Amino acid sequence: MTHQKRLSVPKSWKVGRKGNKWISTTRPGPHSQARSLPLGLIIRDVLKLVDNNREGKRILSEGKVLVDGISRKDLRFPVGLFDVITLPLVNEAYRMLQDEKGRLVLYKLNETNVNKLCRINNKTTVKGGKIQLNLNDGTNILGSNDYGTKDSLILSIPDKHVVKHLKFEVGNLAMVIGGQHSGETGKIMEIREVKSSRHNTVMISGETDFETIEDYVIVIGEDKPEIRLGGEISE
């Protein structure tokens, strides 16, 4: 299915319920539909660079829109959490984050030469005994056992070299990306390992103290966030 009714879009999509009856879906890719927006919707309804999909196809085909430093030409390409959209011709860049309601929003950045934050979802051993790090945005890079599952990496884009390694440990700063505290940030106070089928949990101290499941937590820094979290929101 390439389109869905506007009224049935995922709750994470911050789009009006009024307007065209049908709206594009995301194509299968690095992010799930629930955690991403189609690039065509972003350039038309969010950034308002075009008025319709025909104009959108044209500017994408001309390489005027980059996602994580790579020209993307598919209107249905999924743009997800922490992805960076760059518009070289107007020297602007935006990062996809979540608001307090768990909706995906674009924050305008002060510069276009920025890095990307990713979480290590798991690790696998590949040919030659090398360690492959499988990241939350679908990226796979070679690493070592020094990197742990649920650690975060700051990557340069588009070449994806590791700029900084952030450990998933007590004392580091984290963002919550799911549940009732989605979009909140704070310091990791405790990681509680549960020896059962239930999820491990994490105690976070931010504006309030709260507990959330481990899978919802992404480390974003040590003493301070490694990525810009605030700024102008594009709506």
Swiss-Prot record:
Keywords (A to Z) from UniProt: Ribonucleoprotein, Ribosomal protein, RNA-binding, rRNA-binding
Keyword set includes rRNA-binding: yes
Domain of life: Archaea
InterPro entries cross-referenced by the UniProt entry: KOW, Rib_uL2_dom2, Ribosomal_eS4, Ribosomal_eS4_central_region, Ribosomal_eS4_central_sf, Ribosomal_eS4_KOW, Ribosomal_eS4_N, Ribosomal_eS4_N_CS
Any one cellular-component term (Gene Ontology): cytosolic small ribosomal subunit
Protein's name according to its UniProt entry: Small ribosomal subunit protein eS4
Classification via PANTHER family: 30S/40S RIBOSOMAL PROTEIN S4, SMALL RIBOSOMAL SUBUNIT PROTEIN ES4
Gene3D superfamilies per the UniProt record, alphabetical: 2.30.30.30, 2.40.50.740, RNA-binding S4 domain (3.10.290.10)
